[in-house]
């Protein structure tokens, strides 16, 4: 069973297929990550592999965190992530997880934090139509009606209104791996990935029935 990997979104570009069609792709610096802990059913109640990514400064970590990370290597890591597995006997603490864990043609799920846009209005946040801009209209970007009158006498929870837009965890599923460069730790996937360039993303094999998920160990 294949586990996932942490990486950094570099940005978008395009490749050309055999027919000359432009394919939009996202470039991700995937790993290398280090196995920092192996969790077992007997000790932790479940079986999982914890990996770390990105170098952290000493001053940003507490003593318990530094003690935990130094058990797996000399470098202090900034981001940790767990992946539940059926068994982890093929892994050991300190083992390096690289982009070679994936293969071209495989489908992956990628999670990241969407770009925060702050407090946004109805049109930007939900795509509502605006009102007339001329002929005396005073309703340009106003919300319009938000509900009925005396009954129910309130606005129902979940009503789409202005508010904070973005800055949430988003997962895009079924992205196709089109290229791998293990020399540069580069993973190239077809389509867009949540987050802005430089943000941390979590890449794991797609396990949707009928898709070519991860089978490498």
Curated annotation (Swiss-Prot):
Region (Disordered): 129-161
TM regions (residue ranges): none
Biased composition (Low complexity): 142-153
Keywords: Ribonucleoprotein, Ribosomal protein, RNA-binding, rRNA-binding
Pfam family, one: Ribosomal_L3
Keyword rRNA-binding carried by entry: yes
Domain of life of the organism encoding this protein: Bacteria
Keyword Coiled coil (UniProt): no
Molecular functions per Gene Ontology: rRNA binding; structural constituent of ribosome
InterPro entries to which the protein is assigned, alphabetical: Ribosomal_uL3, Ribosomal_uL3_bac/org-type, Ribosomal_uL3_CS, Transl_B-barrel_sf
Biological processes annotated in GO: translation
Gene Ontology cellular component annotations, sorted alphabetically: cytosolic large ribosomal subunit
Family of this protein: Belongs to the universal ribosomal protein uL3 family.
PANTHER family assigned: 50S RIBOSOMAL PROTEIN L3, LARGE RIBOSOMAL SUBUNIT PROTEIN UL3C
Subunit structure: Part of the 50S ribosomal subunit. Forms a cluster with proteins L14 and L19.
Function description: One of the primary rRNA binding proteins, it binds directly near the 3'-end of the 23S rRNA, where it nucleates assembly of the 50S subunit.
Listed name of the protein: Large ribosomal subunit protein uL3
């Amino acid at each position: 069973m294949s586990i996932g990997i942490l990486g950094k979104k570099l940005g978008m570009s395009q490749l050309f297929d055999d027919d000359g069609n432009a394919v939009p792709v996202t470039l991700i610096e995937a790993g290398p990550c280090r196995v920092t802990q192996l969790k077992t059913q007997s000790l932790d109640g479940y079986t999982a592999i914890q990996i770390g990514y990105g170098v952290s400064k000493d001053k940003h970590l507490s003593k318990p965190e530094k003690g935990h990370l130094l058990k797996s290597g000399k470098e202090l890591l900034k981001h940790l992530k767990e992946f539940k597995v059926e068994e982890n006997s093929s892994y050991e603490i300190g083992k390096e997880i690289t982009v070679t864990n994936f293969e071209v043609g495989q489908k992956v799920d990628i999670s990241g934090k969407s770009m925060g846009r702050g407090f946004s209005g109805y049109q930007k946040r939900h795509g509502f139509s605006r009102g007339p801009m001329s002929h005396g209209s005073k309703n340009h970007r106003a919300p319009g009606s938000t509900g009925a009158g005396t009954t129910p006498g309130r606005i129902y929870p979940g009503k789409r209104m202005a508010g904070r837009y973005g800055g949430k965890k988003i997962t895009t599923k079924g992205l196709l791996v089109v290229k791998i460069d293990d020399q540069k730790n580069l993973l190239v996937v077809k389509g867009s990935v949540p987050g802005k360039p430089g943000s941390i993303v979590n890449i794991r094999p797609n396990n949707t029935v009928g898709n070519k998920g991860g089978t490498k160990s």
